[in-house]
Amino acid sequence: EIWIIPSVGCLNIVESAIEKRAQAYLAGSIDSILAFSHPYGCSQMGEDQENTRRILADLINHPNAGGVLVLGLGCENSNIDVLKEYIGEYDESRVKFLVCQESEDEIQDGLELVKELTKYAGAFTREPIPCSELIIGMKCGGSDGLSGITANPAVGAFSDLLIANGGTTILTEVPEMFGAETLLMNRCENEELFEQTVKLINDFKNYFTSHNQTIYENPSPGNKKGGISSLEDKSLGCTQKSGSAPVRGVLSYGEPVAVHGLNLLSAP
């Protein structure tokens, strides 16, 4: 896959145009060309800006991308020079940068860079890898009254199997842990992780209350129509995705995984 990642939302139209032209020109020579549109990268401050930069850097460094084209506008807060500080060391053959304000034809220049990336990624060969190299994020959606006794436990069984073979899984959707959080706290590998999990839960609860929002009004009309009676009901289903493995890591938003096994991630 070739990924096109803009540093700022102003470039979504340019990014989309490069993607469409590359799809037409390079059809059949690469698995896919994906454009990651977003509305961020400028007029942000503090933690909001920090999160955007970390997530963009994480996408650029993501192992699922054979090659990455990073588009910058040139005048944005999270410009390419800033992003490079978050990216760290990178392979110049795998990651290409284009500052659009410095280009007379950014769409054509972008296409040429995608061609270079496609040639680079085309030299790769598929090969088996051990389970220990797999990191899988777990997600549920459209939950109903049966999710907690069908699909979610099946995901939990998969998580346990992967972890037993040295792999890693990530559980998030923290507001959907409310009411069932003690099930995860009791499985923390040590006291430090226990305290981090308590903070993970309480930080989200405090965020809700600081904005005068009711914590336990999470279930959607679709959830209720499907048979979910309360947030605790929904949360008991959500936590089933974690299986029975011990909690070995607690991650902040955008933080890379550092340990194998079950990790909890701070995200909505």
Task: Report residues per predicted region.
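Metallocofactor- and cofactor-centric catalytic cores in central/energy metabolism, strongly enriched
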Residues: 1-268
